[in-house]
């Protein structure tokens, strides 16, 4: 198995990212964790770049991965389905003819997830947390699956808006509804990618 280097920006605080790094260190033997300001020699290692990170540094690393797709374990530079998007798909299962709302339009989660779900036959509504008519959308649309990963600390959806939705995945603590999935098997996806 090739070595994995996880690159992050230690100057940026993020509890979710730090928890993910701890889980990776616990589950993947020999992983190296490096600050973007002090990058090691990467050799032939697989790279996982984690946000939050300075935009300039992130774009530089993303460009490197586009030029070296064999090192891109996440999929941000190579165009593969990203780790979190794949983990969500593993959790929700078949989506043909289902309506899925995604509250996240990032390149790492929202866009690749929406694209893959459409290819699998789902009807997808993709938006961000600032969408002005979200209450109306949630109450007037027959939604089968809601994926919320806003990343906004002040964004919250009342449980009355989501109670009729069968499957709710909440990766940013956005939903007041207690009946939800709050984690997806990202470490398992990462392990599978390390093997291939």
Task: Describe the residue ranges of each PLM region.
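Conserved beta-strand scaffold positions in the cores of enzyme catalytic domains, especially
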Residues: 30-33, 73-75, 124-126, 168, ...
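Short glycine-/small-residue-rich Rossmann-like dinucleotide-binding loops
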Residues: 52-53, 147-152, 172-173
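Glycine/small-residue-rich loop that forms an oxyanion/phosphate-binding "nest" at active or ligand-binding sites
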Residues: 49-86
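Rossmann-fold NAD(P) dinucleotide-binding segment
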Residues: 42, 56-63, 152-168
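Short acidic/histidine-rich motifs immediately flanking catalytic phosphotransfer sites
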Residues: 41-47, 141-145
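Glycine-rich phosphate/diphosphate-binding loop of Rossmann-like nucleotide-binding domains
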Residues: 3-30, 80-165
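Adenosine-phosphate binding glycine-rich loop
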Residues: 7-10, 173-196
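A short, well-structured beta->alpha microelement
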Residues: 30-41, 129
């Amino acid at each position: 198995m090739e070595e994995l280097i996880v690159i992050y920006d230690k100057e940026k605080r993020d509890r979710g990212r730090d928890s993910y790094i701890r889980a990776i260190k616990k589950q993947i033997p020999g992983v190296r964790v490096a600050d973007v300001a002090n990058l090691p020699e990467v050799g032939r290692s697989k790279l996982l770049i984690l946000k939050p990170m300075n935009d300039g540094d992130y774009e530089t690393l993303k460009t490197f991965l586009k030029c070296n797709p064999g090192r891109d374990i996440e999929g941000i530079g190579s165009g593969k389905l990203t780790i979190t998007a794949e983990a969500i798909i593993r959790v929700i299962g078949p989506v043909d003819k289902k309506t899925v709302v995604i509250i996240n339009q990032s390149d790492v989660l929202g866009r690749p997830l929406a694209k893959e779900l459409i290819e699998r036959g789902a009807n997808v509504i993709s938006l961000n947390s600032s969408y002005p008519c979200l209450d109306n959308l949630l109450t007037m649309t027959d939604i089968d699956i809601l994926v919320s990963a806003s990343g906004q600390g002040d964004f919250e959806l009342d449980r009355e808006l989501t109670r009729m939705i069968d499957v709710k995945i909440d990766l940013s603590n956005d939903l007041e509804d207690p009946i939800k999935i709050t984690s997806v098997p990202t470490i398992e996806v990462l392990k599978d990618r390390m093997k291939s």
